Amino acid sequence: MGVEIKGLTVPALLIKLDPSKSLQENIDELKQKLSSAFFKGSYAVVDYNGLELNEESKVEIEKVLKDFNASVLGFQNTKNNKESLKGVTQKKSLKIINKTLRSGQKVEYDGDVLILGDVNPDAYVVSSGSVIVMGNLRGVVHAGANGDETAVVMALKLRPQQIRISNYIARSPDEPDVKAEESNSPEIAYIENNAIVIDKIK
């Protein structure tokens, strides 16, 4: 079968490892496929698909992607998902929403949330971890809902009605920043000095 790389939504990729091969064989094949300029500068979700991975193995995969200027958004295990979520040593699970959230829709999850689409006005996302939106964030997001002040909110375009991280709240300005609206740089919101700060990701 081999390593599969599929486009989830631009610029996110789903990298599905081959459990019938060793970790090193998967990494070698991944390097070969990532050599295409098409994948450089992408974000990726790695599905280890039943392959046994420890934290060192995940770091090794992240390093390979980093060498090709790609970033890992998270890991998932579709082949054994139920056991994965029950694992006591699991740091934080990742919920992937492969659609746009429309007005009135709400997602709540104990872990990190990756949305492969937009979050429209009056849509809500509540997460105990970080929230990553591979699209426009124009709704309401609460990251670190259980008090995690290290959580972040990332989006390709960050224009929320409200962002909340842990117990800190920020709202979009009444007058939009024209230069910011025209910018194509992804943005990240995080807590610094007891306030939510928004920066561009360069």
UniProtKB/Swiss-Prot annotation:
It comes from the Bacteria. InterPro entries: CAP/MinC_C, MinC, MinC_C_sf, MinC_N, Septum_form_inhib_MinC_C. One of its GO terms (biological process) is division septum assembly. Transmembrane segments: none annotated. Keywords: Cell cycle, Cell division, Septation. Interacts with MinD and FtsZ. Cell division inhibitor that blocks the formation of polar Z ring septums. Rapidly oscillates between the poles of the cell to destabilize FtsZ filaments that have formed before they mature into polar Z rings. Prevents FtsZ polymerization. PANTHER family: SEPTUM SITE-DETERMINING PROTEIN MINC. Belongs to the MinC family. This is Probable septum site-determining protein MinC. It comes from Sulfurihydrogenibium sp. (strain YO3AOP1). The lineage of its organism: Bacteria, Pseudomonadati, Aquificota, Aquificia, Aquificales. The gene is minC.
